[in-house]
């Protein structure tokens, strides 16, 4: 790995960018908790308040672990967000349950989630990088 200031700055910036959506969603959830609970009700999850709190915790704690990478444990945050993101596909973006043209629209959202997972895998791999 190159040991340069530019590489380190780029790595830090990439950690912020790969978690940006999760930060925004988590912060939004803190201030609009009832809406997040209603989302859990809509997808049919039991204990919607617990799942809403868990969702917000996962988004914020996972993001913080990636960005701050304490003692090289950012990979745990990556793993949290990978599992969370993959679970949102069958729970919130089940494209196979729709007919066209909605099926294609939701399928594209699922593909975007897969792409985010790829970025999170890279963040897990770089979690051990030390300047």
Where do the protein language model's features map onto the residues?
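Short juxtamembrane and helix-loop transition motifs at transmembrane-helix boundaries
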Residues: 15, 34-47
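Extended, low-polarity transmembrane helix blocks
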Residues: 1-32, 49-61, 68-131
């Amino acid at each position: 790995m190159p040991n340069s200031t530019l590489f380190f700055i780029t790595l830090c910036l990439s950690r912020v960018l790969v978690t940006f959506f999760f930060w925004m969603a988590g912060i939004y959830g803190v201030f609009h908790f009832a809406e997040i609970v209603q989302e859990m009700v809509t997808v049919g999850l039991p204990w919607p308040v617990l799942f809403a709190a868990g969702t917000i915790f996962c988004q914020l704690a996972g993001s913080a672990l990636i960005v701050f990478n304490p003692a090289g444990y950012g990979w745990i945050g990556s793993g949290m967000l990978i599992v969370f993101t993959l679970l949102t596909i069958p729970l919130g973006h089940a494209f196979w349950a729709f007919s066209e043209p909605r099926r294609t629209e939701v399928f594209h959202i699922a593909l975007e989630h897969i792409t985010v997972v790829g970025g999170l895998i890279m963040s897990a791999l770089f979690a051990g990088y030390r300047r």
